[in-house]
Amino acid sequence: MKTIILGPPGTGKTTTLLNLVDEFLKDGIRPRQIGYFSFTKKAATEAADRAADKFGLDKENDLPFFRTLHSYAFNQLGMTKEKMMGRDDYKEFGEKCGIPIKTAKFSNEDGTFNSDNEYLTIINTAAVKRMDLLEYYDSRKNILDIERNTLFLLSEELKRFKEEKKLKDFNDLIEDFLLKETSNKFEVLFIDEAQDLSLLQWEMVRKIWSRAEKTYIAGDDDQAIFKWAGADVDHFIALKEE
């Protein structure tokens, strides 16, 4: 069963989800059978804090599945921070390829990628949109400073760099999660801040909810704050018709 909860900011969508969490816990659903995934770490943490305080639970042990999607993939794949692409790795990659990279990192708060290098930004955005890189390039406007062939070569070189160093980025984690044969089965699944999810994240959400008894998805169908990072609000809106 899937329930969609829509509304603009401040209309109580998250409060509705939190009240539902309370109800299911009161009804005897075990905390570890509840998945609560949000776009931002802040929202997931607030949900876990409320449930832990109200029911005397330990966040780490009793509520391990109140997370962001990239954090859940990280956890399920048994990753460590040392295996993740970091600022120094991107800097080394830039030096190796002869391109300037002052800033390049994924946010631990919401999983978005930020870089001062437009090539890396385009490579990342194509990945979260699940688009062929060159097709995405061709669909863009006002990127005259980006050379098509250079973009493709840098993308291939970045793949080799990560393979050689056995490193992953947040997009790789979700793609690897999608390839897993199994995932946790939840009695109840909550998805908050749904309007900000990318198509790549929606594929992960669909895999998780395919094994959930009940699913509640909340978001604002009129606004996506993270469109610049690949948020696919149209996919969210289309859920109402399914």
Positions of the model-derived regions?
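P-loop NTPase Walker
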Residues: 1-82
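Short, hinge-like loop/turn segments at secondary-structure boundaries
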Residues: 53, 82-84, 232-236
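Conserved P-loop NTPase motor core of helicases/translocases
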Residues: 62, 70-99, 174-179
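Conserved phosphoryl-transfer catalytic core
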Residues: 86-110, 212-224, 240-242
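Short, well-ordered alpha-helices that flank and scaffold nucleotide-derived cofactor binding pockets
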Residues: 19-26, 49-53, 175-182, 203-210, ...
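Conserved helicase motor core of SF1/SF2 NTP-dependent helicases
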Residues: 8-11, 39-42, 195-242
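A generic structural signal for alpha->beta connector loops
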Residues: 31, 60-63, 185, 212, ...
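Accessory N-terminal region flanking or inserted into the helicase ATPase core
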Residues: 1-7, 15-16, 33, 105-190, ...
